[in-house]
UniProtKB/Swiss-Prot annotation:
Optimum pH is 6. It catalyses: Hydrolysis of (1->4)-beta-linkages between N-acetylmuramic acid and N-acetyl-D-glucosamine residues in a peptidoglycan and between N-acetyl-D-glucosamine residues in chitodextrins. One of its GO terms (molecular function) is lysozyme activity. This is Peptidoglycan hydrolase gp36. Component of the cylindrical core that assembles on the inner surface of the capsid during procapsid formation. Plays a role in ejection of the bacteriophage DNA into the host cell at the initiation of infection. Functions as an exolysin that catalyzes the cleavage of the host peptidoglycans. The lineage of its organism: Viruses, Duplodnaviria, Heunggongvirae, Uroviricota, Caudoviricetes. Residues 1-35 are annotated as: Disordered. It comes from Pseudomonas phage phiKMV. Residues 15-24 have a biased composition (Polar residues).
Length: 898
């Protein structure tokens, strides 16, 4: 009985107490299965027998017990509460409306129905309807046995209920059998389809395009086979076909879907199915793009890193990669040129790297420009080189800071490292900060402090490279260091002060902000501007090299005040507004941000005239906050932008009475106009000229492309037009000279010599090609030469001349590359022996007597015969006669040495 009660409870039926409520039971019938069993049920057969054989006694039993049974039936009816709900459930109905006397029958019938439903869901679905009938007949025996002892009326109703229950069970089994049979038929299709998809995926993964194409063709035939098969019903064909296409898209085998779609095999598909498949198709494409994009990004990052590290030196590979990035729309022309330039000038170019290292250590900005780089790029390459040589991060940061501040630069890569150290020290509890980290930061700050004693802008230079989030802390620490407080302690105090400020009310914060803004005009004076944006170039007077024109100073003042006001309004800087030291630090941050947005237009001091103490021959273009050079000019090469602008609008214009007017630049973000404004010596605007920034940007890109082509030619060779003939040449040499310099020198030399395919009379005999000497007298007369042979002889002759030039330079104390090449050119033209006959000229070179040198050359027979070449020699030798300080002032070392 316990098992029967458990089974009944699983059906949701409690004997003697129904839980059905109106509307809870949904009507179900045999019709749901769409398959009806027409054979006789066991219950109907027994019912027919009882109706025929027991007709006489049935009436008596009914007459005797009618009142009692009606009462029982009424009670049951009342307990049901909802007849419609009860009628819809043939299993619950006996418990509610029949008024059965025997509880055992009701439980037995419920157990029977539950058991048969479970059986149908498992093994029963594999039986034919006839096999199931036999099984059901056996299982129904104990249910019919439980009707024994009932009065005829109860028995009749019980058997009728059993008949309905069996009819429902037969319908359920017939539908389950049909589904199972169809599934068995479709299983073969599914197995074959999965095999085809697996082969397609494997072929795609291994890159076997032939196998993949065969798999796609097989998949198309398979789909058409499904849709025309007589082994499965039409609706099942559609279902299996849909499943196959969905699976193919899920596995990113879109070629199957595309082929069938394009061939028209999907035209008869329903709109809903087509819409569903199209959604899966688009999803598959998006997934593939995401995977390919991620893989491409990883591959790109790896390739670019290898190029940066000098591991890839094949320019053809780099060029093909860059061209592909442009064609795919992932890079602009400017980005491609920049990448190729970095490849040409990266760590893989050992000779060039040696030149960069030497220029950095000498503080020679001009030499860096000759090498085609700027201070920031050079410092970053220096850092990579030091890292490759095993230098620690601490040593690299400290030495790099010294080199950078010496040249007025603090790269953002250095700033990020400092910012990271600041965050870690601030996060550590007192006494728990990493000692090495603390020492590193102390050393860096000491370098800055030493530089600030000589040049007040050094600290601001550093701040311009620090991440925005750490600028406040670093500016505060720099100020505190002047008062003897260690950087780590100052950083912790800054954090503590920030916590205190958080507790301040808004009124107090507002008062601090107002006080700071009200005092800005007094603080941002000319002295502040000169100290921050200039450099202490005149060691005698202490003045900076910044232009003293009122218009230029006013630009810096306005930009700094505007930036300071903006920073003061940001609540994260509230901690700096609570003290004089903090306010000074905030002002330094403002100036650093302005520095970052300033493009210097011009070449700096007037080195050509040898004026060491002149102010800077340049003017600023201060971009508004939020505007970048990339947005305005289409390139971030601010150095070349400044050069181009200076050529188009000279920073200084000589006046009729001897004074100089200044040309500065103003950009109005609202109107998008860039103006070159000429100011007189009092800062009054004289003229305004509109500048086309896009045209400037195009010129910058052209120059960078030309520079790249020249570098490519120096490294790998290029055709150079000489007298209308292409002569192949490069910068390779055995003297150890920079290839770029040698390439340019050879191009210049070739134009002087000119190309002649037939031997021509020379001073001592005959020459051919590009000045190749054939011998004295008539030796070589009538000789002809091809451009290829002429190029080969020219490379050999110039290489020999370079060795001679280096030898002469060593004897004469010449170290400048341009001047060494000047001596090599002299040796190429007349030979080393004849060159040495210029004894007085060589002595003037040795004595660095520029006037005597120039006089000696211009008064020579050589000058009379080939004046252009002699003048070129004078020009190339000019850097040798400049003092070392004029080539690259190492103000930092000179000042600290004092």
């Amino acid at each position: 009985m316990a098992e029967s009660q458990r089974a009944s409870q699983e059906l949701g039926i409690n004997v003697g107490q129904t839980q059905l409520q109106p509307g809870q039971s949904a009507r179900r019938g045999v019709r749901d299965s769409e398959v009806n069993y027409s054979g006789p049920s066991v219950g109907s057969q027994i019912l027919d027998g009882i109706l025929g054989a027991g007709q006489q006694i049935a009436g008596k039993w009914f007459e005797h017990n009618v009142q009692q049974e009606v009462l029982r039936g009424e009670r049951a009816r009342m307990a049901g509460e909802a007849e419609e709900a009860v009628d819809s459930n043939v299993l619950a109905k006996p418990f509610v409306k029949g008024g059965w006397r025997k509880q055992d029958y009701r439980i037995a019938q419920a157990d029977f129905s539950l058991k048969m439903q479970r059986f149908i869901a498992n093994k029963g679905r594999e039986m034919t309807p006839e096999e199931f009938r036999k099984y059901l007949s056996q299982e129904a025996t104990h249910v019919l046995d439980s009707t024994e002892g009932m009065n005829p009326n109860d028995a009749l109703q019980a058997l009728a209920q059993q008949q309905k229950a069996e009819e429902q069970l037969f319908g359920m089994q017939a539908k389950a059998y049909m589904d199972w049979s169809i599934d068995q038929a479709a299983r073969g299709f599914r197995t074959q389809g999965n095999s085809i998809l697996a082969k397609a995926v494997q072929a795609q993964a291994t890159g076997d395009e032939l196998s993949r194409q065969l798999s796609l063709e097989e998949a198309g035939l398979f789909y058409t086979n499904i849709m025309t098969s007589e082994d499965i019903p039409l609706e099942v064909r559609d279902k299996v076909g849909m499943q196959f296409l969905a699976a193919s898209l899920d596995m990113n085998q879109r070629g199957i879907y595309e082929g069938l779609r394009d061939a028209g095999f999907l035209d008869s598909m329903s709109f809903d199915d087509r819409r569903a498949l199209n959604g899966l198709y688009e999803k598959s494409k998006a997934q593939t793009r995401a995977k390919e994009s991620m893989a491409t990004l990883r591959a790109d990052a790896d390739f670019q890193q290898r190029v940066a590290n000098g591991a890839i030196t094949d320019l053809a590979e780099v060029e093909a990669y860059s061209r592909g990035m442009v064609e795919e729309g992932r890079w602009s022309d400017a980005q491609a040129i920049s990448f190729m330039t970095k490849a040409m000038t990266g760590l893989g170019n050992a000779q060039r790297m040696q030149g960069i290292m030497a220029a950095l250590e000498a503080g020679d900005i001009n030499a860096l420009h000759t090498l085609g780089t700027n201070v920031t790029e050079a410092l970053e390459q220096w850092d990579k080189m030091q890292a490759a040589n095993g230098s620690s991060l601490t040593d690299r940061l400290v030495q790099g800071t010294q080199l950078g501040l010496r040249l007025g630069t603090f790269p953002k890569t250095y700033g990020e490292s400092v910012g990271s150290a600041v965050r870690m020290i601030q996060a550590a509890k007192e006494g728990e900060a990493n000692p090495e980290l603390v020492n590193t930061l102390n050393s860096i700050f000491e370098q800055v402090a030493s530089a600030q004693e000589i040049n007040p802008s050094a600290g601001n230079v550093m701040l311009s490279g620090i991440p925005e989030a750490e600028q406040g802390a670093v500016a505060w620490a720099l100020k505190q260091m002047k008062m003897g407080i260690a950087p780590a302690q100052a950083l912790r105090e800054f954090s503590a002060n920030a916590e205190v400020v958080k507790q301040m009310d808004e009124f107090e914060k507002g008062q601090n902000t107002k006080a700071f803004k009200d005092n800005l005009g007094k603080q941002v004076n000319d002295k502040f501007v000169n100290n921050i944006f200039g450099r202490a170039w005149n060691m005698l007077t202490g003045e900076s090299d910044l232009s003293n024109n009122e218009a230029v100073l006013s630009m810096y003042r306005r930009a700094t005040i505007d930036e300071a006001n903006w920073l003061a309004s940001d609540r994260k800087h509230a901690g700096l507004l609570t003290s004089d030291t903090g306010r000074e630090a905030l002002l330094e941050i403002a100036a650093a941000n302005v520095r970052n947005r300033t493009i210097q237009v011009g070449e700096g001091r007037n080195l050509k005239e040898g004026d060491l103490f002149s102010r800077r021959d340049s003017a600023p273009l201060i971009l508004p906050r939020g505007t970048t050079a990339e947005q305005l000019f289409g390139t971030n090469d601010t150095e070349t932008i400044g050069t181009v602008l200076a050529e188009q609008h000279k920073p200084h214009v000589e006046g009729l009475l001897g004074y100089k007017s200044v040309v500065a630049f103003e950009y109005d973000r609202t109107s998008g106009s860039l103006l070159a404004v000429e100011y007189d010596e009092n800062g009054v605007a004289l003229d305004r000229t509109r500048v086309d920034p896009q045209a400037v940007g195009k010129e910058v890109l052209k120059r960078n492309a030309d520079k790249l082509n020249a570098m490519r030619g120096a490294e790998y060779g290029a055709n150079v037009k000489v007298s209308g003939t292409d002569i192949r040449m490069n910068g390779g040499n055995s003297a150890g000279m920079l290839k770029q310099d040698v390439f340019n020198w050879r191009k210049e030399l070739a134009q002087f010599e000119a190309y002649r395919g037939e031997a021509y009379k020379d001073a001592d005999g005959y020459s051919v090609g590009l000045g190749h000497y054939l011998g004295s007298g008539n030796a070589g007369a009538g000789t002809t030469v091809t451009p290829e042979q002429a190029a080969q002889w020219f490379a050999e002759d110039t290489d020999r001349a370079l060795d001679q030039g280096v030898r002469l330079a060593d004897e004469l104390g010449v170290t400048n590359n341009a001047s060494i090449l000047g001596l090599a050119g002299m040796a190429f033209q007349m030979g080393e022996g004849r060159a040495r006959q210029f004894r007085n000229t060589f002595q003037a070179i040795k004595d660095r007597n520029k006037e005597a040198f120039e006089a000696g050359v211009r008064n020579s027979k050589w000058y009379t015969q080939t004046p252009d070449r002699a003048e070129a020699f004078i020009k190339r030798m000019a850097p040798h006669f400049d003092t070392p300080s004029q080539i690259g002032v190492d103000w930092y070392s000179a000042a600290t040495a004092e």
